[in-house]
Amino acid sequence: MIKLTARQEQILNLIRDAIENTGFPPTRAEIAAELGFRSANAAEEHLQALARKGAIEISPGTSRGIRLRDMGGTRSDRSGAQLSLPHPALMQLNLPLVGRVAAGSPILAQEHIEATYNVDKSLFSAKPDFLLKVRGMSMRDAGILDGDLLAVKKIDSAKNGQIVVARLGDDVTVKRYKKTGSLIELLPENPDFQPIRVDLEHDDFALEGLAVGLMRTWN
């Protein structure tokens, strides 16, 4: 077991809770606000200490680039009690990996399936239905990078602020969702990209799923 200070354990539980509830880790600013730090730099110092101890991995250059590492079998709740985790063999999912999506065809059509991954379902905030290979860097500041595998749960509707997989005409995109009346904005997490605006009365739009987690592969 990795030995952590009380503050480090608090931050680690905060990261876990954020991933469980939203599918994504918190930003440094969010950690600082939650724990009453004066600046995001204080949160960064604690994150670096957690990384040195092997509790997390940090991806440079992204505000949400925090990855939990397996610390072996237990975690603490807010009262400090130790909670047992299910055995990994009982927590496996077989998820199809969707690559490029052909225009006009269902996202889970057989020709889009590049592979099948056997993964631990405890990695995700909700049970996903498929993995989508991310193309491009428009969601960089949410910690979603080109080539990442986004875990997606199929949905019919979404809440403002959630990260979704959306189909607009013949294109499939990953963006943050915002709806006002019949107008939808698909918001990037990178200032180099512009929002996509959708008029439901005129545009061909559909939600393909909700992002519930992320996997990164290294060559």
Swiss-Prot record:
Q: Which GO terms describe its biological process?
A: DNA repair; DNA replication; negative regulation of DNA-templated transcription; proteolysis; SOS response
Give the protein name, as stated in the record.
LexA repressor
Known role: Represses a number of genes involved in the response to DNA damage (SOS response), including recA and lexA. In the presence of single-stranded DNA, RecA interacts with LexA causing an autocatalytic cleavage which disrupts the DNA-binding part of LexA, leading to derepression of the SOS regulon and eventually DNA repair.
Instruction: List GO molecular-function terms, semicolon-separated.
Output: DNA binding; serine-type endopeptidase activity
Q: What is the originating organism of this protein?
A: Herminiimonas arsenicoxydans
The positions making up the signal sequence are: none
Q: Name one Pfam family in it.
A: LexA_DNA_bind
> Which domain of life does the UniProt lineage start with?
Bacteria
Assembly, in brief, is: Homodimer.
Q: Which SUPFAM superfamilies match?
A: LexA/Signal peptidase (SSF51306), Winged helix' DNA-binding domain (SSF46785)
- The family this protein is said to belong to: Belongs to the peptidase S24 family.
What InterPro entries does the database record attribute to this sequence? LexA, LexA-like, LexA/Signal_pep-like_sf, LexA_DNA-bd_dom, LexA_repressor, Peptidase_S24_LexA, Peptidase_S24_S26A/B/C, WH-like_DNA-bd_sf
Positions bearing the site annotation: Cleavage: 103-104
